[in-house]
Swiss-Prot record:
GO cellular component term of the entry, any: phosphopyruvate hydratase complex
Entry binding sites for Mg(2+): 242, 287, 314
CDD domains registered for this protein in UniProt: enolase (cd03313)
The keyword Lyase is annotated on this UniProt entry: yes
Gene this chain is encoded by: eno
Record pathway: Carbohydrate degradation; glycolysis; pyruvate from D-glyceraldehyde 3-phosphate: step 4/5
Protein name: Enolase
Pfam families with a match to the protein in the record: Enolase_C (PF00113), Enolase_N (PF03952)
Lineage: Bacteria, Pseudomonadati, Myxococcota, Myxococcia, Myxococcales
Length: 429
């Protein structure tokens, strides 16, 4: 019934105007699944390879015609005839066809597009929403949105070093109300920034991208916005940071250089910096607080703050079970960021989430800075029981599309729906 009968691919544009790949998989029932692959701005060194053309005369070298050719000429002949409902077999066939550790032969973007499109086709053929098809009958937990309302680092042209400042509506009674909390703080922050004379242009993920005196000033302004929105910081809304520390780590000196505020720290100094922020503000989560291969400072950070805060590994783990298993064994971090294109297949993504949950780590489903209207990660956040999702601010359709899909899922679940709230954060339980 769900035998794959056709695979096609095309080049489309993502939210930054760069090409990406979109794949359609058709099955014997006549159902067709479609998936568009996202792309990151700050990418970890250990991520699966996103295959680009490299032709500087076309899309500045960022075209994906090579990946499309690999889908049409290599992957399609190998998967036509397979059952789209047997995700593990399908993904393993593509992984073996590629034969490299980082999917560099065919491209992780090519493999992932087929992987996700096949899952969608199978879900449609079975008459099930994607979250139910992947997650089963127990999939009913709506995630807490970690809403990136102020952008810095690689996501903005500003002097703010920390990449994302997020509001976390952990005290809301439902996802719909959580989204309202976040949107109202987002709008309040615009008024706060305007009053200060700061810019209100937005970055890649829809958050404001002003020039500020320091990273701490960003937190102070968000606290003011929470208050002006009529909400209580710490109870209704917490704060979260994505430091993307690999972006400001100087390998030659071993120092973390916060250029925007003229400070440089060694590992211990950086941990002290985070501890001082956490003592002053209701921060519930810090992502990529240390560089991706600075395991010693990660260990120090976990020992210092791991019992109080969620410490999320993004570039550290890259949704890879090998790196995650090392982190678990060494007691590093306590949460994993889940990005489907970091590893390049749905099966491997699900394996990483299962490993994290077995070890008592939390998981956060995440978008990339280069997104499309595709809403797959919204369904996957519910299917995987992540309890948290990062998909940008309350602006830009590529971000809001995921939130709107979660609103639909919550409505469809009705009284069975459960909003994760504070329970999504191990340290707050």
């Amino acid at each position: 019934m769900t035998e794959i009968i056709n695979v096609t691919a095309r080049e489309i544009l993502d939210s930054r105007g760069n090409p990406t790949i979109e794949v359609e998989v058709a099955v014997g029932t006549g159902d067709v699944g479609r998936a568009a692959v996202p792309s990151g701005a700050s990418t970890g060194e250990h991520e699966a390879l996103e295959l680009r053309d490299g032709d500087k005369g076309r899309y500045l070298g960022k075209g994906v015609r090579k990946a499309i050719a690999n889908v049409m000429d290599e992957i399609a002949p190998a998967v036509v005839g397979l059952d789209a409902g047997d995700q593990a077999v399908l993904d393993q066939r593509m992984i073996e066809l590629d034969g490299t550790a980082t999917k560099s032969k065919l491209g992780a973007n090519a493999i992932l597009g087929v992987s996700l499109a096949a899952a969608k086709a199978a879900a449609q053929a079975h008459g099930l929403p994607l979250y139910r098809y992947v997650g089963g009958a127990g999939a009913r937990t709506l995630p807490v949105p970690l809403m990136n309302i102020l952008n810095g680092g690689a996501h903005a042209d500003s002097n703010v070093d920390i990449q994302e400042f997020m509001v976390v509506p952990l005290g809301a009674p439902s996802f719909a109300e959580a989204l309202r909390y976040g949107a109202e703080v987002f709008h309040a922050l615009k008024a706060v920034l305007k009053k200060k004379g700061a810019g209100t242009g937005v970055g890649d993920e829809g958050g404001y991208a002003p020039n500020l005196a320091s990273n701490e000033e960003a937190l102070a302004l968000i606290m003011k916005a929470i208050e002006q929105a009529g909400l209580k910081a710490g109870d209704d809304v917490g704060l979260a940071l994505d430091c993307a520390a690999s972006e400001f780590f100087e390998k030659s000196s071993g120092k973390y250089d916060l250029e925007g505020e003229g400070k440089a720290f060694d590992g211990k100094g950086l941990v002290d910096f985070y501890a001082s922020l956490a003592a002053k503000y209701p921060i519930v989560s810090i992502e990529d607080g240390c560089a991706e291969d600075d395991w010693a400072t990660w260990k120090l950070l976990t020992e210092r703050l791991g019992s109080k805060l969620q410490l999320v590994g993004d570039d550290l783990f890259v949704t890879n079970v090998t790196r995650l298993s090392r982190g678990i064994a060494e007691g590093v971090a306590n949460s994993i960021l889940v990005k489907v294109n970091q590893i390049g297949s749905l099966t491997e993504t699900l394996e990483a989430v299962r490993m994290a949950h077995r070890a008592g780590y939390t998981s956060v489903m995440s978008h990339r800075s280069g997104e499309t209207e595709d809403t797959t990660i919204a369904d996957l956040s519910v299917a995987c029981d992540c309890g948290q999702i990062k998909t940008g601010s309350a602006s830009r359709t590529d971000r809001v599309a995921k939130y709107n899909q979660l609103l639909r899922i919550e409505e469809e679940l009705g009284k069975a729906a459960r909003y994760a709230g504070r329970d999504a954060f191990r340290a707050l339980r």
